[in-house]
């Protein structure tokens, strides 16, 4: 579900990272969690491939004792608290992509990876992903792990029965605009009563925003969530509701999963990691699915980084470990282990990722996700985006689920955004 407790917590604590980390003095002596030859790595369940972690421990055993620790619960809060407490700080820390903007303003608490030679690896990674790990002052805080290119998942037989294009290349070519996508949804509903093209309006709104180069706050700390790029995404979501191509179901609920299984929800816009969600959530649909390009251009949803904290006593060795763990073959293994889509284009052609997928009717989904990952637009991510984007996501959901008047919902969203902006010191 989109409005999980975790998601709400993130929205409410938008400025926490900046406040907590900002309390540390630059260059202070910070006790580390590692002692002697130990090197501590923090990450979360599914944040790294288990095979890659295991192999890294074995590979560097002669120089360090790599202690890779999976941190449960609210990872960001625990990392921030530990760093602010100046004790037991990990040498290497995973940083979730959705939280990255909160860490970048405090770049002085991390080792600048460029000073360790990061630039020589730059051309091996997606440009837009590489840029996301760099702070405004030029410090490279995060080394790329994965990304989440968004594509169009659909059920082959249902589309065929509805008289829609059903081969991946045809779906990509013929549903390449939002208008054509919506028209397909209307045809689907007409030919197969009770069916919907997508689960909810938030899928349309959020993906439309994520297709562009701007979000909710710009580099000058100015609120831009009332500008044309957001208004356009809002209008598309409202149109999807008005044209009745979205369901009244909530994503992730038993009713929604049943509708997917029954072919009543035969389509969704999802990131590469949604392949795993489908396989575990609706295993009986094996073989029914295919993947095509999403309308207009790809968006990104997800992806994380590895960092080296200032507490690290052996940053050069930590960097060697990071760069090895994140090379193309290991990123491919991370995809096999945990569905982490590689940020290294060289991975896309490796045999490991090129096996036909029976769940997707034998399709090689890398033919879609690989090119999509390379076409994503670089966007500025502000530490205030989460807080100032949430009212818009909440209100468009009210339009979709509760039938709230779109104009009233927009007005209410803007009022909430102004109050939050005032509190955070964001101009509008």
Residue ranges, per PLM feature:
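Conserved N-terminal structural module of periplasmic/extracytoplasmic solute-binding proteins
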Residues: 1-102, 119-121, 296, 313-317, ...
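Extracytoplasmic/periplasmic substrate-recognition and gating elements
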Residues: 58, 84, 242-243, 281-342, ...
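Short helix-initiation/N-cap motifs at beta->coil->alpha
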Residues: 69-79, 98, 174-180, 248-262
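Paired acidic/hydrophobic, glycine-rich loop segments that form the ligand-binding mouth/hinge
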Residues: 91-94, 266-271
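Hinge/lid segment of periplasmic solute-binding proteins
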Residues: 96-151, 290
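Short, solvent-exposed loop/beta-turn-alpha elements that line the ligand-binding surface or hinge
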Residues: 114-125, 169-174, 214-233, 280-284, ...
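Glycine-centered hinge/linker elements that transmit conformational signals in sensory
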Residues: 182-186, 220-250
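C-terminal capping/gating helix-and-loop segments adjacent to ligand/active sites or protein-protein/ligand interfaces
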Residues: 250, 363-416
């Amino acid at each position: 579900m989109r409005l999980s407790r975790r998601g709400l917590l993130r929205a409410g604590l938008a400025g926490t990272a900046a406040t907590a980390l900002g309390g540390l003095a630059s260059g202070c002596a910070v006790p580390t969690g590692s002692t002697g030859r130990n090197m501590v790595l923090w990450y979360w369940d599914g944040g790294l491939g288990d095979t890659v972690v295991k192999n890294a421990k074995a590979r560097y055993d002669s120089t360090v004792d790599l202690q890779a620790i999976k941190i449960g619960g609210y990872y960001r809060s625990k990392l921030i608290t530990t760093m602010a407490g100046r004790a037991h700080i990990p040498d290497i820390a995973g940083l979730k992509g959705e939280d990255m903007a909160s860490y970048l303003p405090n770049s002085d608490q991390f080792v600048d990876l460029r000073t360790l030679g990061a630039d020589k690896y730059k051309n091996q990674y997606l440009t837009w992903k590489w840029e996301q790990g760099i702070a405004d002052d030029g410090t490279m805080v995060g080394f790329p792990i994965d990304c989440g290119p968004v594509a169009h998942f659909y059920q082959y037989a249902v589309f065929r029965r509805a008289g829609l294009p059903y081969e991946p290349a045809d779906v990509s070519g013929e549903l390449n605009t939002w208008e054509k996508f919506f028209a397909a949804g209307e045809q689907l509903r007409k030919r197969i009563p009770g069916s919907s093209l997508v689960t909810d309006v938030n899928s349309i709104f959020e993906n439309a925003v994520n297709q562009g180069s701007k979000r909710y706050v710009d580099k000058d700390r100015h609120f831009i969530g009332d500008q044309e790029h957001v208004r356009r995404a809002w209008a598309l979501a409202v149109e999807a509701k008005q044209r009745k191509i979205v369901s009244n179901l909530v994503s992730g609920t038993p009713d929604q999963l049943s509708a997917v299984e029954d072919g009543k929800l035969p389509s969704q816009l999802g990131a590469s990691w949604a392949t795993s969600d489908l396989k575990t959530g609706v295993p009986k649909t094996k073989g029914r699915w295919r993947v095509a390009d999403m309308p207009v251009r790809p968006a990104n949803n997800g992806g994380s980084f590895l960092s080296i904290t200032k507490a690290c006593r052996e940053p050069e060795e930590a960097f060697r470990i990071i760069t090895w763990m994140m090379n193309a073959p290991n990123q491919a293994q991370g995809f096999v282990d945990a569905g982490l889509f590689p940020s290294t284009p060289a991975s896309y052609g490796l045999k490991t990722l090129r096996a036909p997928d029976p769940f997707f009717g034998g399709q090689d989904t890398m033919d879609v996700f690989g090119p999509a990952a390379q076409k994503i637009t670089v966007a500025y991510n502000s530490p205030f985006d989460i807080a100032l984007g949430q009212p818009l996501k909440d209100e468009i959901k009210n339009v979709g689920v509760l039938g709230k008047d779109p104009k009233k919902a927009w007005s209410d969203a803007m009022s909430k955004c102004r109050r939050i902006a005032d509190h955070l010191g964001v101009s509008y």
